[in-house]
């Protein structure tokens, strides 16, 4: 029996970091050593980039888009993009517009995969199960649930992503720095 192939692309971020008193870069694909895929599934890893998403700039996004456009999607059941959570929704929205009909799921984590209570493995499993289901709902985000990439808001102070109630409506700039809104944000281990 031929195995179903899923391409997993590492870009860095917390999902590819190591736990400790601070979160530091480690290996973009180390989660593949911790995750057991379903029977009949072969995860093919490519460490394309290694940076925290908060350091993404225009040049990086151009490189990422070029890389993602160069993938032969027909060779895989789907593609998982491991990404940092800080700019996850921005990159996801960009890729949703660039690759609207591709089987692509962006996956992030609140803490490194080996940290106690990390959502890294469950988020990866959600992405794999979604791709195996054959659903064709466009680019998705797997982070404590499945979210449409084009209509997901930035994480709130408790690291939860939400669906935008009215996507693509311009909003007024905040007058606050946001600090008052995020007093309850937990510190990362």
Regions found by a protein language model. Give the residues of each.
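Active-site histidine-anchored catalytic micro-motif
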Residues: 2-189
